[in-house]
C-alpha cells in the first residue's frame, strides 16, 4: 500500500483540479439531471462493460436520448456503427432497462448500498462494478469501481493475490473494503479516489 500511496502523492497536485471538476459534473448530473439524463448514463455504464470508457463516451455522444426511445433494431444498428463488440445484446439490455425510467432519481438520492443492490438485481447488463460506476457518475462518493485497471494496480501492489474472474456480493464488498482503506489513507472517498487511480494509469480523468 505504501508504494501505491507514494505514486499517488506524486500526481495528486496535477490531478486534483481535474478530479474536482469531473466530480462536480457528476454531482450536477445527479442533482439536476432528468430521468432521461440518468437513463442515458446508466446505458453508458451498460456499454462500457467489456468495452471501454472511450467507446461508451463516443456512443453516448452519437446516440444521446436515443437510448430512451429508439426501437431495438435501430439502437443495435447505432451501436454497430460506433463499433460496439456486442451491439445486439447491449441494445436488448438497454431497451429492457427502460422499465427503470421513473425510478432512477430516487436510486441516486437513496442509500447507495441499497441502490447498488437494486440495480444489480433489476437492471440488465449491470453487475456490481457497473452499478457502482453509474452511482459514482451521478455524484455518489461511497462506492468503489473495481474495473480491470484498478484490480491490476491492486494486484501489482500486493493488495489482492489474484484478479477475480467474476463477482459475488461477498467478494465485491471484500475487495471494495480493501480499496476503501487505501482511499482513506490517501484522504479521499472511494468515488473520487477512483479518478486519481485512473489518472495514475491513463494520465487523464475519464468518467
Swiss-Prot record:
InterPro entries: DNA_glyclase/AP_lyase_Ogg, DNA_glycosylase, HhH-GPD_domain, HhH_base_excis_C. Signal peptide: none annotated. Keywords: DNA damage, DNA repair, Glycosidase, Hydrolase, Lyase, Multifunctional enzyme. The record marks 207 as: Important for guanine/8-oxoguanine distinction. One of its GO terms (molecular function) is hydrolase activity, hydrolyzing N-glycosyl compounds. It catalyses: 2'-deoxyribonucleotide-(2'-deoxyribose 5'-phosphate)-2'-deoxyribonucleotide-DNA = a 3'-end 2'-deoxyribonucleotide-(2,3-dehydro-2,3-deoxyribose 5'-phosphate)-DNA + a 5'-end 5'-phospho-2'-deoxyribonucleoside-DNA + H(+). Its EC number is 3.2.2.-, 4.2.99.18. One of its GO terms (biological process) is base-excision repair. SMART domains: ENDO3c (SM00478). The active site is at 129, 147. Belongs to the type-2 OGG1 family. Catalyzes the excision of an oxidatively damaged form of guanine (7,8-dihydro-8-oxoguanine = 8-oxoG) from DNA. Also cleaves the DNA backbone at apurinic/apyrimidinic sites (AP sites). This is 8-oxoguanine DNA glycosylase/AP lyase. It comes from Thermotoga maritima (strain ATCC 43589 / DSM 3109 / JCM 10099 / NBRC 100826 / MSB8).
